């Protein structure tokens, strides 16, 4: 359920692409510094977006660090990086999210990969829990609710996707301050979008395997594709509305690129492969 909140690289200037890469590398670097090489396995575009958003919103409140270094992925050529206070926050959330997700994969499917990842991330997550107990508790509680809905075979899209929406709302609420309502709104609607897009993307595979998918019945109804498009548009419109109320200046064009264009890339790719059937 990761990798949907991405930039549209084709629509970015070379300078904006470089700034995104420096933020991505900065998050990777801080994950490594806090949690070691194993932690870097949890790096995602989704947490890079949160880092960009919080770093822009709270610009000037914490020191900005920049540099250029070699890394395990780039051992020959140095890469530029940047990080600030929110970067460490996102680094902790990254390992916690992947830990609890791996825990669920082992508990639900007896996935050996999940078990291995859970063991690998146990110590880093314990450190993250100490620093961010509210957020980590919310991750576990929301995933538990989601597991219950899935066990029941629920097709209540609002309730099921709302679990992941609540989870993301808690993570976006960095400081519980006067920006909380808008940050929580962005996280909530983006979380619902991510969950439903993941279900939309996985539907064919889930149908073949006979595994749970909340869209199992809906996809058989006339107008399914149009309804999903409307749901996605509404959720992202709510994200954008709350985002535009925030006084973000740094990287605002990059953030808009992600929210208005990048988040649609995987939907557009999937939709192009499975266009709506023409009415007979």
Where are these regions (language model features)?
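Short, electropositive alpha-helical surface patch
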Residues: 254-260
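Acidic catalytic motifs of isoprenoid enzymes
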Residues: 1-185, 192, 196-233, 241-251, ...
């Amino acid at each position: 359920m990761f990798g949907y909140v991405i930039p549209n690289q084709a629509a970015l200037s070379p300078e904006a692409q470089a700034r995104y890469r420096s933020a991505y590398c900065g998050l990777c670097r801080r994950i490594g510094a806090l949690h070691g090489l194993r932690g870097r396995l949890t790096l995602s575009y989704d947490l890079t977006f949160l880092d960009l958003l919080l770093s822009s919103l709270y610009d000037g409140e914490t020191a900005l660090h920049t540099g250029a270094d070699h890394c395990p992925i780039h051992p020959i050529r140095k890469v530029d990086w940047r990080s600030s206070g929110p970067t460490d926050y996102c680094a902790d959330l990254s390992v916690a999210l992947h830990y609890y997700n791996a825990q669920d994969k082992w508990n639900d499917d007896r996935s050996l990969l999940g078990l291995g990842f859970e063991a690998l991330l146990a110590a880093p997550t314990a450190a993250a829990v100490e620093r961010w107990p509210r957020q980590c508790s919310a991750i576990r509680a929301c995933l538990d609710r989601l597991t219950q809905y899935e066990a029941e075979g629920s097709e209540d899209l609002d309730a099921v996707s709302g679990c992941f929406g609540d989870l993301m709302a808690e993570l976006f609420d960095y400081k519980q301050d006067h920006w909380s309502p808008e940050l929580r709104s962005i996280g909530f609607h983006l979380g619902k979008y991510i969950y439903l897009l993941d279900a939309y993307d996985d539907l064919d595979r889930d149908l073949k395997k006979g595994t749970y998918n909340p869209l199992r019945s809906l996809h058989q109804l006339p107008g399914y594709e149009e309804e999903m498009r409307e749901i996605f548009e509404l959720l992202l419109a709510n994200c954008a509305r709350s985002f535009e109320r925030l006084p973000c200046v740094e990287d605002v064009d990059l953030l808009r690129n992600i929210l208005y264009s990048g988040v649609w890339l995987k939907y557009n790719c999937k939709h192009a492969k499975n266009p709506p059937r023409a009415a007979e």
